[in-house]
From Swiss-Prot:
Membrane topology: Peripheral membrane protein
Matching InterPro entries: ATP_synth_F1_dsu/esu, ATP_synth_F1_dsu/esu_N, ATP_synth_F1_esu_C, ATPsynth_dsu/esu_N
UniProt-annotated stretches for the region Disordered: 103-133
Keywords, comma-separated and alphabetical: ATP synthesis, CF(1), Hydrogen ion transport, Ion transport, Membrane, Thylakoid, Transport
Superkingdom assignment: Bacteria
Source organism of the structure: Prochlorococcus marinus (strain MIT 9313)
Stated family: Belongs to the ATPase epsilon chain family.
Protein name according to UniProt: ATP synthase epsilon chain
GO molecular function terms noted in the UniProt entry: ATP binding; proton-transporting ATP synthase activity, rotational mechanism
């Protein structure tokens, strides 16, 4: 038994195939999906989705969105996504360091749009780095 998995971003279909297991970064924590899972709709956080297909684990960096599980069909609709194997690890690490420096620089400041954007950029950069591993 397997799952039918589709990961869709506004500009591309990131994954469309079968999987034995999916681990999603929901806003309340990680959710594991196996064949026969109960129906579910959940919000997704910025993070890494893990997919076990053909016995091998693959990572996909997700930039927030929603997931729906119905029977053995899993549909993931996200604001953006990248396959871990297509991310340049060196570039991703450098972007993470820049984002971390920006967040540190804003520490102690009052909440602002700029501070929120800096934190979101940090979360995205961290997800991209984690997806390369």
């Amino acid at each position: 038994m397997s799952l039918t998995l589709r990961v869709l971003a506004p500009d591309q279909s990131v994954f469309d195939g079968t999987a034995e297991e999916v681990i999603l970064p929901s806003t309340t924590g990680l959710i594991g999906i196996l064949p026969g899972h109960i129906s579910l709709v959940t919000a997704l956080d910025i993070g890494v989705m893990r997919v076990r297909a053909n016995g091998a684990w693959n990572s996909i960096a997700l930039m927030g969105g929603f997931a729906e599980v119905e029977a053995d069909d899993v549909t993931v609709l996200v604001n953006g996504a990248e396959l871990g194997k297509s991310i340049d690890a060196t570039t991703a690490e450098a972007e993470l360091e820049q984002a971390k420096a920006k967040v540190s620089q804003m520490e102690g400041q009052e909440p602002s749009t700029e501070k929120i954007k800096a934190q979101q950029n940090f979360n995205r950069a961290r997800a991209r780095v984690q997806a390369t591993k």
